[in-house]
Amino acid sequence: VRRGFKVYQLNPTDLTASIAYNPLDAASTFPEMQEIAHILVRTATKGTKVDPFWLQGAEEILGILIKCLKSHPDATKYANLANLQYLLQAFGDGTPLTPFVAATAPDDATYHAYKGFISQADKTKQKEHSQAKDSLAVLADPDIARLTSANSFDFASLRREKTALFLVFPQNRVSYYSLLANLFYTQLFHHCLDDRAYRPDSLPIYFLLDEFGHLTIPDFPAIITTTRQRRISLSIVLQSTSQLV
C-alpha cells in the first residue's frame, strides 16, 4: 500500500476481506464456457483413474447447463456455480430440466445436445451425471457458494494501475480450494494474453505461482510460450520436480 499498490485478495476463509469471483460471469463464448466444464471435471478427478468416456459425458452436461444459465434473461443473478449445482441436483432422469433447457438454450444445437444426453441408456446417463455432480461437491460449502455468486474484481485493472492480488488459501487445505485457484488462474491468464486487453503501454504482470503442483491449468505449456510477448513474468514454486510431470 505504501508503494502505491491497490491490494486485493481472493480469500474463501474471510469473505469480508475477499473479492467476489464468479467464473461464469467471465465466460462469454462457448469455448470459455466449455473450458469451465473441463476444469470442474478435471480438478475433481486429478490423481484418479477414470474412464475418459465418463469425463467427456460429465463435461458435456456441465457445458450444456452453463450455456443455458448464461442465456437466462437474468443471467447476472442466476448464472453461477451454486445454481449449476442446483440444476444437477434437480436432474433426476433429465426430464425435470427439459422445460428449463427449452426456455434458455442459446441455440437449437444446445437444446438437441441436451435431448441427446438424456436419451442415453439410464446407466450411462446416471454415471455421467454423477461425475458432473461430484465435480461441484465443494459448492456444498456455503462460503464458496457465496464467494462465487458475484464478481467484484476487474482483471483489466491489473494492466491499468499498480495492483497486488493475493490468492489466500490455508496451507493444509490447498487441495480443497484448488478448484477456485484453477478457474481463477485460467481465466486470468486468458485475459492477460488477449490481444484486445493488451497495449504496448500496459503495465507488466508478475505471477508467483506457489503450490503449483496443486494446480490444473489447461494448456499451460502454450500459455508459457506466449507470456513474454505480453510482458508477463512467471515464477513457479514446486515441492518436488515430480510435480512437473
Give the role of each language-model region.
Residues 227-245:
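Sensor-1/coupling segment of RecA-like P-loop NTPase cores
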Residues 1-232:
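P-loop NTPase motor domains
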